[in-house]
């Protein structure tokens, strides 16, 4: 059985990490690595529903992984902690 790989920042410290959430956060983080954007753009890039993306963006913001810029529409970007990826050293 193949083990799924998730973005290292998809794991949350204060909440239970279930597979569906890890998958969604991985898609959101991968979309943000390509460039910042508003919730609608990120939802389209990640192929997720807008409300799912917004829920996970708020969770990631509470962990300090993403930040939201002021203005309409709000633009989401990765923070310094969000840009740091773990390197696999096999």
Language-model segments: residues:
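Short, Lys/Arg-rich nucleic-acid/phosphate-binding segment
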Residues: 21-22, 70-76, 81
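Short capping segments at the starts of secondary-structure elements
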Residues: 33-38
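A short acidic, leucine-rich amphipathic alpha-helix
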Residues: 41-45
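Short amphipathic alpha-helical interaction segments
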Residues: 48-61
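A short, conserved structural fragment
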Residues: 61-70
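Conserved segment of winged-helix/HTH DNA-binding domains
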Residues: 81-90
